[in-house]
């Protein structure tokens, strides 16, 4: 088995202590992911290193960090793809969140913003299958047995959100305005808006989007969409909200 000796530079912070970087050298398989390197540091060198991990296949979002300054999921990022073979591979916590310890951040703000839209992160748009799917693909099933909701592709793209916080970390506006609803929060508002025609509900949601810390604070950098590991396209959702708000404004100006 081909092995790599990788110097891993980890951001360290404990409450009451000054932040610093510690570098550890770990030997890992050439096909290993960054989370495997962090695991090796914890197992071999220092069990005080704090980090989150879960599924190991990009479905839970808990491990999200910055790798060489770029927001990524270390569970699906191979070391060989991000390490130059010489300099230490740097791992740091996400930006725009309070740091709890080392690579662990407090993501409470992310969920608070998403809850502003009463957004339940449940994949309601998944295909309903009245039987257990084992080794065959959904695409191979009889279409008559698969019930897909209207506009399935649009809904499923948003509901692939794994609440990792990467979009919030990548967003330049979040660094300047801590009250900004953020890409995840505004994407949730957009999705909730698309699910309702109730006038009161629509006014509430668009009022949030049109507020001081809503869509107009976005700098249209599209960093959130670029960084999103699940192709949710939060920037596209923000632009869609802007278009609806502008259309409503023109409608009112025309007296309709």
Question: Which residues are covered by each model-predicted region?
Answer:
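Extracellular/mature segments of secreted proteins
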Residues: 63, 82-85, 226
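Ferredoxin-type iron-sulfur electron-transfer modules in oxidoreductases and energy-metabolism complexes
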Residues: 32-47, 92-256
């Amino acid at each position: 088995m081909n092995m790599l000796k990788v110097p891993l530079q980890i951001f360290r912070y404990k409450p009451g202590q000054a932040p610093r970087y510690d570098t550890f050298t770990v030997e890992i398989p050439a096909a290993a992911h960054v989370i495997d390197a962090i695991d090796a540091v914890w197992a071999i060198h220092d069990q005080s290193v704090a980090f989150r991990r879960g599924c190991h296949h990009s479905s839970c979002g808990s491990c999200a960090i910055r790798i060489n300054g770029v927001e990524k999921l270390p569970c699906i990022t191979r070391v060989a793809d991000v390490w130059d073979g010489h300099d230490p591979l740097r791992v740091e916590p996400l930006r725009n969140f309070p740091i709890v310890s080392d690579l662990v951040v407090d993501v409470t703000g992310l969920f608070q913003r998403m809850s502003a839209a009463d957004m339940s992160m449940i994949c309601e748009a998944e295909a309903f299958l009245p039987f257990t799917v084992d080794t065959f693909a959904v695409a191979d099933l009889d279409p008559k047995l698969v019930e897909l909701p209207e506009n399935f592709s649009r809904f499923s793209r948003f509901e692939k959100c794994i609440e990792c916080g990467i979009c919030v970390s990548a967003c330049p506006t979040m660094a300047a305005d801590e009250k900004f609803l953020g890409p995840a929060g505004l994407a949730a508002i957009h999705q909730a808006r698309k699910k309702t025609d109730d006038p009161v509900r629509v006014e509430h949601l668009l009022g949030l989007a049109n507020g001081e810390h809503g869509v107009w604070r976005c700098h249209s950098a599209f960093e959130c969409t670029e960084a999103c590991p699940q192709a949710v396209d939060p920037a596209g959702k923000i632009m869609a909200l802007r278009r609806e708000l502008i259309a409503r404004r023109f409608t009112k100006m025309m007296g309709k």
